[in-house]
Amino acid sequence: MRPAGRSANQVRPVTLTRNYTKHAEGSVLVEFGDTKVLCTASIEEGVPRFLKGQGQGWITAEYGMLPRATHTRNAREAAKGKQGGRTMEIQRLIARALRAAVDLKTLGEFTITLDCDVIQADGGTRTASITGACVALADALNKLVANGKLKTNPMKGMVAAVSVGIVNGEAICDLEYVEDSAAETDMNVVMTEDGRIIEVQGTAEGEPFSHEELLTLLSLARGGIESIVATQKAALEN
C-alpha cells in the first residue's frame, strides 16, 4: 500500500495556480501533493552572445529551494557562495525540457528565464518545476503575441514530467519523499504532450533493473504525463 493509498499508476493531485505573482510575464504555483514550487517566466529583449545575429531566441532556467522547504533547514546557496552540483543539474534539465516546447526561430531575439523556487519539497521537485514552468512559459508567450511583439506564437505544445520508480519490487508513478528515499530504482521522465521523450534520467539505487522493467516504467510515465498535460491544458483555459 502506498502512503496516500494511491494505485501504482496514479499521480498525486496536481494543481496549477496561474498569475500567482503580479510582476512576471508568467507565474504559476504548481503543487504535486505536498510538493509546491513557484515558477515564473521573465522576458528580456536580446539573446546570449553566442546566439547574436542568428535570429533565434533562448530559454534558460534557474532552480532553488527555500531553506525550510525540507525537513531540516538547508543554508541558502548564496550564503555558501556557490551553487551545488544538484542545483546546476536540475536547472539545466528544466531549460532543456522547455526549449523542446518552443520554436526558437519563431521566438526571435528574446530570452525567457524560468525561475523555479521550491517552497515545500516532498519528492519530485524537478518534475513539478518542469510542469509548472511550462504553463508559466505559455502565459509569457501569449503576452508577447498579445502585445504585438510576436506575430506567431512559438509554442509547439505542452511539456510535462513525472518521476517513476521501483519500490519494494513494484513499479510506481510520481514518488513522494518516503517512496523516493526507499526506491530501488528512481527515474525522471520528460515528454511532449504527444508522448515523445525529451529526457530520461534513471538510476538503479540498489538492484539493477531489467529491460522489461524499464519499459514498464516508461509506460507508467507516459500515462502519468498524459494526466498531467490534461491538467496543464485545463489550467490554461481558465
From Swiss-Prot:
Keyword Manganese applies: no
Keywords tagged on the record: Nucleotidyltransferase, RNA-binding, rRNA processing, Transferase, tRNA processing, tRNA-binding
CDD domains: RNase_PH_bact
GO molecular function: 3'-5'-RNA exonuclease activity; tRNA binding; tRNA nucleotidyltransferase activity
SUPFAM superfamilies: Ribonuclease PH domain 2-like (SSF55666), Ribosomal protein S5 domain 2-like (SSF54211)
Enzyme class, first EC level, given as a word: transferase
PROSITE patterns recorded: RIBONUCLEASE_PH
EC number: 2.7.7.56
Binding site for phosphate: 86, 124-126
One Pfam family per UniProt: RNase_PH_C
Catalytic activity: tRNA(n+1) + phosphate = tRNA(n) + a ribonucleoside 5'-diphosphate
Signal peptide (from-to): none
This protein's record includes keyword Aminoacyl-tRNA synthetase: no
GO BP terms: rRNA catabolic process; rRNA processing; tRNA processing
Coiled-coil segments: none
Subunit note: Homohexameric ring arranged as a trimer of dimers.
Membership in a protein family: Belongs to the RNase PH family.
Function description: Phosphorolytic 3'-5' exoribonuclease that plays an important role in tRNA 3'-end maturation. Removes nucleotide residues following the 3'-CCA terminus of tRNAs; can also add nucleotides to the ends of RNA molecules by using nucleoside diphosphates as substrates, but this may not be physiologically important. Probably plays a role in initiation of 16S rRNA degradation (leading to ribosome degradation) during starvation.
Name the UniProt record assigns to this protein: Ribonuclease PH
UniProt source species: Salmonella gallinarum (strain 287/91 / NCTC 13346)
Gene field: rph
